[in-house]
Amino acid sequence: MTDISYSNVNDNTPVLVGNSQLTDKRGVNGYNYLEMLSEVSKKAILDCEASNNLSEHIDTVAVVRFVADTPHRDSATSNLWGYPNMPRSLSNSLNLSATNEIYTTTGGNSPQLAINELANRIKDNQIDCALLAGGEALDTFVGRLKEGLETKWEDNPGGEPEIIGKSDDGTNDHEKLHGLFDPSAVYPLFANALRSLNNQTIREHMEDTSELFERFSEVASRNEFAWFPIHRSCLLYTSPSPRDYTR
């Protein structure tokens, strides 16, 4: 076995030390946003297996923006959002003394954006140790709204986090006029564009897509954190049913 020496590695080399995941399927009884991030962050800190109290060294807390906190998004969840400074709320819940509070813009690229930004700041000696957290509690939040249950999830610790990332609107005025905002309305346009490009019939496109998603589901069936850890056949994907609706 090769003896690997790290003596020539700079002290400011970014290293991912620990991580954790959490899937909460308790529906209306699930975690709120802050509880969820706090729980998974505790597990990530423990995963670092540090010999001393790592919490004392975390000087930066970064959080990936939630869908429910997307600016200009006309939805009940946006109107009820009650966490104006989630990085500080999370820091307080973990008894951290982080002096840097970072919150990303909305986007599928935001987790990687945050990783890159934190790594660069560590490299440039701007920060020493960072905690990055993100997740969604929409299943619980929307479920409680549907059942008329209390949804006063909020914490206002004061201050304003630093915002990183581009905040460009994902749709223009014409697209908004036609309701083209949520993925369920936009993705079918992409699918039909691909079908046209490939000169396929609707049936041919469905069969190709079903084969792709069967492979995805096969991978998910082996992942304990998958929302649907079930291996579904192509036939299930080409046969619409009420159980296919996930929102």
Residue ranges, per PLM feature:
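Condensing-enzyme catalytic core mediating Claisen C-C bond formation in acyl metabolism
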Residues: 2-38, 155-180, 187-219
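Single conserved hydrophobic/aromatic residue that forms the stacking wall/gate
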Residues: 237-247
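Short glycine-rich phosphate-binding loop at a beta-alpha junction
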Residues: 58-64
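Accessory "access/gating" subregions that flank catalytic or transport cores
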Residues: 229-239
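Active-site-proximal alpha-helical scaffold in enzymes
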Residues: 105-136, 181-223
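Phosphate/pyrophosphate-binding loops at sites that engage ATP/ADP/AMP, CoA/4′-phosphopantetheine
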Residues: 45-58
